[in-house]
């Protein structure tokens, strides 16, 4: 599996980028959010990736953060949500906004994405509520402003990678962010969240 790619940005389009890695051009499908932040052609780029292998195709999806990739994996675990639909959702909602929409049962927020109708939006909310349910329980996290979404999402990803369950990780990260306040660094949030989760 290809977990990430670092290379020179050869070209971009409305829905994908091509990275030149050691002379090989990798076509990577990305959300509009990732493409808008990827930088100029010719620059050095690091993308976290998810590779899907099917009988007729091998497809690479690229993300600006591990948190966005984790959200993509959750979305594609829902019946009826393929890679393109997941990217459409992540084009209009960042990982933190998606977590809050699921926790709050806000199907209209999810249905803003192209190709997502009310029924699919409701299925996403229902199927992901248990997997992302801890977000609603984490004090302060559900109401966190968008500016903190990146830190909270990356901290959640870090704790999940260390083996904590989503509910445990969300509660610990939420408590850490509430205690540290605005402007807390990812390192500080993760350290405090680990102490809280270990109690």
Curated annotation (Swiss-Prot):
It is found in: Cytoplasm. Belongs to the RuvA family. This is Holliday junction branch migration complex subunit RuvA. Pfam families: HHH_5, RuvA_C, RuvA_N. The lineage of its organism: Bacteria, Pseudomonadati, Pseudomonadota, Alphaproteobacteria, Sphingomonadales. The RuvA-RuvB-RuvC complex processes Holliday junction (HJ) DNA during genetic recombination and DNA repair, while the RuvA-RuvB complex plays an important role in the rescue of blocked DNA replication forks via replication fork reversal (RFR). RuvA specifically binds to HJ cruciform DNA, conferring on it an open structure. The RuvB hexamer acts as an ATP-dependent pump, pulling dsDNA into and through the RuvAB complex. HJ branch migration allows RuvC to scan DNA until it finds its consensus sequence, where it cleaves and resolves the cruciform DNA. Has three domains with a flexible linker between the domains II and III and assumes an 'L' shape. Domain III is highly mobile and contacts RuvB. The keyword Transferase does not apply. Homotetramer. Forms an RuvA(8)-RuvB(12)-Holliday junction (HJ) complex. HJ DNA is sandwiched between 2 RuvA tetramers; dsDNA enters through RuvA and exits via RuvB. An RuvB hexamer assembles on each DNA strand where it exits the tetramer. Each RuvB hexamer is contacted by two RuvA subunits (via domain III) on 2 adjacent RuvB subunits; this complex drives branch migration. In the full resolvosome a probable DNA-RuvA(4)-RuvB(12)-RuvC(2) complex forms which resolves the HJ. Residues 65-143 are annotated as: Domain II.
């Amino acid at each position: 599996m290809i977990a990430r790619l670092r290379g020179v940005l050869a070209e971009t389009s409305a829905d994908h980028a091509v990275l030149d890695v050691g002379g090989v051009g990798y076509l990577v499908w990305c959300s509009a959010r990732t493409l808008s932040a990827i930088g100029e052609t010719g620059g050095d780029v690091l993308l976290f990736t998810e590779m899907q292998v099917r009988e007729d195709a091998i497809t690479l999806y690229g993300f600006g953060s591990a948190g966005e990739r984790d959200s993509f994996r959750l979305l594609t675990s829902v019946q009826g949500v393929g890679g393109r639909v997941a990217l459409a959702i992540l084009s209009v909602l960042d990982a933190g906004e998606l977590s809050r929409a699921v926790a709050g049962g806000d199907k209209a927020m999810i249905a803003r994405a192209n190709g997502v109708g009310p029924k699919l939006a409701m299925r996403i909310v229902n199927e992901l509520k248990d997997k992302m349910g801890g977000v609603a329980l984490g004090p302060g996290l559900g109401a966190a402003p968008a500016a903190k979404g990146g830190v909270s999402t990356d901290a959640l990803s870090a704790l999940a990678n260390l083996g904590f369950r989503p509910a445990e990780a969300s509660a610990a990260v939420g408590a850490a962010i509430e205690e540290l306040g605005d402007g807390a660094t990812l390192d500080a949030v993760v350290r405090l969240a680990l102490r809280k989760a270990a109690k």
